[in-house]
Amino acid sequence: MILIGVDPHKSSHTAVAVDAAGHQVARRRFVVNAGTFRRHMRWCEQWPERRFAIEGASGFGRSLAQQLVAVCENVVDVASTL
């Protein structure tokens, strides 16, 4: 299982894939535009068993979270402050 953490900002999203042991296996920055979701999903296809943790899914990450849920991905919201 891979956990894909996403730090969304107004103009870009940074995604980091972490394995079950907590090791970073990949990292990618996506510029936010009309093709962002498609590129993000293409990158994630290499991990068929995955979950998403989106920082601030009710803020800048809202659109991404909604699109992921719409295609039946497992998504959790992560608070932007501890």
Predicted regions and their residues:
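Phosphate- and other anionic-substrate recognition elements at nucleic-acid/protein interfaces
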Residues: 1-82
